[in-house]
């Protein structure tokens, strides 16, 4: 007597029969794969269109025409931009560190794009909290020299690619020097050396921690934090910078308290 046996196979789940968690997982995986493919295709299209950045290594900013007396005292200048160029080794460490504390604390650690900063900015945006921006010094150099400020995905992607390219071609010190000599700081002053003269009437090397903090607060919004036109907003921004400088170990407790109490003499 023989027994008839039937093949019993596992039922195939249709999409409608799949549990919700599995559907979500498939959708997320598909979305991630599509996003990655789109990103790679965008990079392949945009990278050949990036501008030549080799000239940055030999950067020479345009200088205004200056008029001096016979004994070397400047009595005037011509040009829309006021600027003094300083090589990296002549920019005081205090000024460099003050700027990095508020603009890009991980500058010497990231490759041009700070993913930790990006994630921090996303979290802050989701929780409606204010934080420092996610753009690095290198990204700001890329934007200042080569790009517009239009807020499009393609422009942001170009900025990221340019930042990686610049980091590959230049040293960190070269990039920081470019930024500190080129950035606009209000009152027609470009670069920190010129800003020190414009706002305080002294060379960059003579600035106190309080004065360095005032200048370091300008790149974010030079019109809003201009110490001549908006002394109260400039003071508030300076206090934020001093707090960052103290938190990053740029200044100690005594210097922090002294800088907060210092009354600055700003040129009118």
PLM region spans:
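N-terminal type II signal-anchor transmembrane helix
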Residues: 1-68, 106, 126
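Residue-level signature of transmembrane alpha-helical entry/exit and packing/kink sites
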Residues: 23-27, 93, 155
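Terminal hydrophobic membrane-targeting helix
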Residues: 46-98
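Short, solvent-exposed loop/turn elements at domain surfaces
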Residues: 74-77, 107-109, 224
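Flexible, acidic/glycine-enriched loop-and-adjacent beta/alpha segments
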Residues: 87-137, 193-194, 200
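Short, glycine-/polar-rich solvent-exposed loops and beta-turns at beta-strand/coil boundaries
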Residues: 58-59, 78-79, 111-117, 134-135, ...
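Non-catalytic, structured segments within soluble enzyme domains
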Residues: 39, 128-268
């Amino acid at each position: 007597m023989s027994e008839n046996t039937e093949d019993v196979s596992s039922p195939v789940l249709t999409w409608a029969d799949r549990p919700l968690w599995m559907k979500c997982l498939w959708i997320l995986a598909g979305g991630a794969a599509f996003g990655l493919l789109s990103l790679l295709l965008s990079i392949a299209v945009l990278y050949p269109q990036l501008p030549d950045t080799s000239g940055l290594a030999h950067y020479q900013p345009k200088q205004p025409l200056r008029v001096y007396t016979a004994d070397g005292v400047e009595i005037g200048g011509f040009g829309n931009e006021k600027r003094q160029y300083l090589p990296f080794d002549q920019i005081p460490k205090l000024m460099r560190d003050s700027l990095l504390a508020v603009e890009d604390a991980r500058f010497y650690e990231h490759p041009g794009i700070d993913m930790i900063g990006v994630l921090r900015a996303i979290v802050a945006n989701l929780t409606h909290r204010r934080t420092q921006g996610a753009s690095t010094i290198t990204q700001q150099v890329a934007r200042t020299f080569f790009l517009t400020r239009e807020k499009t995905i393609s422009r942001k992607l170009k900025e990221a690619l340019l930042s990686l390219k610049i980091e590959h071609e230049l040293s960190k010190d070269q990039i920081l020097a470019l930024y500190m000599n080129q950035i606009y700081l209000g009152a027609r002053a470009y670069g920190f050396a010129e800003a020190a003269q414009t706002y305080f009437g002294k060379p960059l090397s003579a600035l106190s921690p309080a004065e360095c903090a005032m200048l370091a607060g300008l790149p974010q919004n030079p019109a809003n934090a201009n110490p001549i036109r908006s002394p109260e907003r400039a003071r508030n921004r300076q206090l934020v910078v001093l707090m960052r400088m103290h938190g990053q170990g740029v200044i100690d407790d005594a210097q922090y308290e002294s800088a907060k109490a210092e009354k600055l003499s700003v040129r009118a």
